Amino acid sequence: MWRIWQLFDPRQALVGLATFLFVLALLIHFILLSTERFNWLEGASTKPVQTSMVMPSSDLAV
């Protein structure tokens, strides 16, 4: 493992890794924001629920 750090500068490698992870996190968040289900800024679109009222038939007609 120590030979790897002789090939690469540790400071540059860590800065590069942090930059890559930050860009990846931004990309994932923007992809989620572009979907309707996971867009937490605008909220989920609430569609009106369709209900049907059924009146029970009365078999005991007088």
Curated annotation (Swiss-Prot):
Gene Ontology process terms (BP): photosynthesis, light reaction
Job of this protein: Antenna complexes are light-harvesting systems, which transfer the excitation energy to the reaction centers.
Membrane-spanning intervals of the chain: 13-33
Residues the record lists as binding a bacteriochlorophyll: H29
A GO term for molecular function: bacteriochlorophyll binding
Compartments reported by the entry: Cell inner membrane
Residue positions, PTM N-formylmethionine: M1
Residue ranges listed under propeptide: 53-62
Organism encoding this protein: Rhodospirillum rubrum
Name listed for the protein in its UniProt record: Light-harvesting protein B-870 alpha chain
Entry GO CC: organelle inner membrane; plasma membrane; plasma membrane light-harvesting complex
Membrane side Periplasmic: residue ranges: 34-52
Keywords: Antenna complex, Bacteriochlorophyll, Cell inner membrane, Cell membrane, Chlorophyll, Chromophore, Formylation, Light-harvesting polypeptide, Magnesium, Membrane, Metal-binding, Transmembrane, Transmembrane helix
Subunit structure as annotated in this protein's UniProt entry: The core complex is formed by different alpha and beta chains, binding bacteriochlorophyll molecules, and arranged most probably in tetrameric structures disposed around the reaction center. The non-pigmented gamma chains may constitute additional components.
Record topological domains on the Cytoplasmic side: 1-12
Gene3D superfamilies for this protein: Light-harvesting complex
Family indicated by similarity: Belongs to the antenna complex alpha subunit family.
Membrane topology annotation: Single-pass type II membrane protein
